[in-house]
Amino acid sequence: MLTYTYVSEGKFELMEKPKPVLQHERDAIVKVTLASICSSDLHIKHGSVPRAVPGITVGHEMVGIVEEVGSAVTNVKPGDRVTVNVETFCGECFFCKKGFVNNCTDQNGGWALGCRIDGGQAEYVRLSEHIGKLSLGYLNNTSTGAIKKTMEPGDIATSGLA
């Protein structure tokens, strides 16, 4: 599959990588339908994120369709349209339980997706066991309309998927 990959400071490349597969019971494979470049991706490119791993597929802002789920995944099923939380978190540590998932103490907690683990600037993304239970949200038709800019003046769209 085609991916947008961080190679080294100042250098990203379109690269072919194998399609991800389930590795853990809490994994999900999502076919990416829309992805966005974030200023965080640019910070990686410009060398401002020393923990970014060369060779990683960037991107943590995406939507898609669930293709496959591990045996412990209960909140989504294949065929569901989802939006992906930009934060990776365990859901069990002190900070996660208080709602401060960006401070998760797990080694892959905080901002890992597209920085330390392969992200969504690709055809498919594996959302690892380090993606907490609440990280996949249903994407409804109103949200899709807002994302694809098919909304008309006067329409009302959701601004969050909590």
Question: Locations of the language-model features?
Answer:
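Cytochrome P450 core scaffold surrounding the K-helix E-X-X-R motif
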Residues: S40-H46
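Extracellular beta-rich ligand/substrate-recognition surface
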Residues: T5-F12
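Short Gly/Pro-enriched turn/cap motifs at secondary-structure boundaries
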Residues: V7, K19-P20, V53-G59, A112-I117, ...
